[in-house]
Amino acid sequence: MSINEKASEERINSRRKALSKILVSAAALGTLGSLTRANAAPASAAPTPAPEGAAGKINGAPGIILDHASTSWAKIRSDIHRGNGPVDNYAAFQQLVEDKKYLTIDTPVSINKTVKLNLKNQIIEGRGNGIITPLGNMGNGFLLELTADATQIHGMVFDNPMLLKSETGGRQGGIMISANFCEVSNCYFYRMLQSVIAPASFGAYGTKITNNWFLECLGAGTGMRDLRSKLGEDRGDAVTIWGSGTIMTGNHAYCKAGEDARLAFHAEGLPGARKHVRDFDHKDIIMANNMAKGSFRRHFAMENINGGISIGNISMGGATWWGEAYIQCKNINVKNTIRYSNSPDILNGNAWRPIKAAIAVVNFNEGVNIDSTVLIAKGTKAYGFAIATQTGDHDVTLSGSMINEGARTNTALFLNQPKSFRINNLDTRGFSRAAQITTNEDVTITSNNCYHQLNGTGKGVEVVKGSGGNITINGDTYSGATTAFKLPNVANLSIQNTRVSDSERFAELSGIKQSLMVTNNMCTTDQSLPLVYSDGAAPDISWSVEGNIGIRSNFSCTSAQLSSINSHLNQRNKHAGKNVSVNNNAVYVALGNAPDAPWLNLATQKVVKPA
């Protein structure tokens, strides 16, 4: 025997010895599955088979216990009796997930009861023909419930081919997350009422929902069948997470045609849900780079979230209420793309009387910064942005762009009594109005450096119901409005450095309660545009209308206002060199800042000293 042949034989013998040691150490004999020493029994001894259907046993499983197993290895499959329909695999499958930490689903599995995953750090993955489906009595239960921390579900397929669902009671669905630090990734969910949920009863922390497909999602609303029904607002979601520290990214959600579903992607905090609130409850949500399409009532939503990012998401059309919505949130940053295409004939959830919009803020919000792009599609009636309900204070900043290809009567912004609303660098095109506003005494609205190209059918910015409040417009551009500004009954109004073109009037004003400033504006029309104040030409408020180009107004002080030391003219905003028109036939110049400083008539040199 040569040296090479001898070395080769030694290597083969060495491998045989190593393999024998591995097999001996892993051998399991008998139904108890206890490990034995290598010389305890002949090598041909076989484990005692378990009785057919015995509880807690896996029929047909060999006697070697490993950390990893597959459903094909355990002979778990629902199509074993093809002629009589699917077999219930619940008992064997539940036992398998309790025994194995690393599990591959590579066969069709059907269950009639929720399977609970109780092993910490368990990993379950799908391959080949692996799929989990519910049997007929699971119209109100989830296929899997994760009850142990750090559970991972990868590459699985879940299907609800019988379209099981319930309008009340328990929810049909794919995965319920009742543990922390869990992940659902690269899975397919078909025809689910509630694909993935982390319920409020637990409040999961550190959840990751990444790169999944939620297809043909179902809803529990009655749609057009019953417009008086309020069903469907507690279920019918692709993903809903009640908890904190959640990341949802890279997912697709498509609603089944004709369904009245609730939400594609939803994150909600837990204020009041826990007796002792943890530091991280209802905080820190990332919702990024997801896509949603179809008749969900809203595609992307956050509720009661303190500290969230919604960015890079695309609402692809079909949302029946709102493309994105922010409800009772705080400290939220938003930058998404919304295509709003719901037909005005689709009235899903009409009993709730939703104000339809591409973007909505609801109830109350603080520190919400929205910088999204919006397209209102052909044939659609909706706002670009709306304060849909107002039960508290809204503190919101809005920017981005909005294009209206829908009804010519559409308005870009519906601002219903926001406490603090800032519009910065917003570009709108094709709308009838830039903004429809209702005010109260606590409202403050500012608009800075915005561009509005309107379609010639409505006012630019219009207060439809006013009772005080403050409106400031600075550096905006308005084109194609019948009247650029119709702003009655506000407390303080300032319009400065603004350009208006292709309009019939610059402004219609009335009922200004405290102060009015219209300065340094420009109208680039063939003829000057009127600024009309319907309460008369001499309002007893602090006002300044000056430095404007292409704007004509009949604002003028009276002799009584000029001579009274207590008039607003003398008490507020008086400065040396200020000139005012008096009775529309004389110009007076202030000779000082004090209320009693005299006024000089430039033509006659007459001096009037207030007293």
Predicted stretch roles:
Residues G56-T71, N579-K609:
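Short, surface-exposed terminal/edge motifs of secreted or surface/virion proteins that either
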Residues N121-I131, L143-R191, T210-W213, T249-Y254, ...:
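Parallel beta-helix/beta-solenoid
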Residues I551-V582, N601-A611:
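Extracellular/surface-exposed low-complexity repeats and stalk/linker segments enriched in Gly/Pro
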Residues L135-E145, L164-M176, R191-A204, L218, ...:
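Extracellular beta-strand/beta-solenoid scaffold signature
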Residues P49-A92, I551-C557:
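Right-handed parallel beta-helix/beta-solenoid
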Residues M1-K17, S25-A28, R37-A41:
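N-terminal secretory signal peptides
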Residues Y90, Q94, E98-I123, R127-N140, ...:
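N-terminal extracellular ligand-recognition/capping segment immediately after the signal peptide
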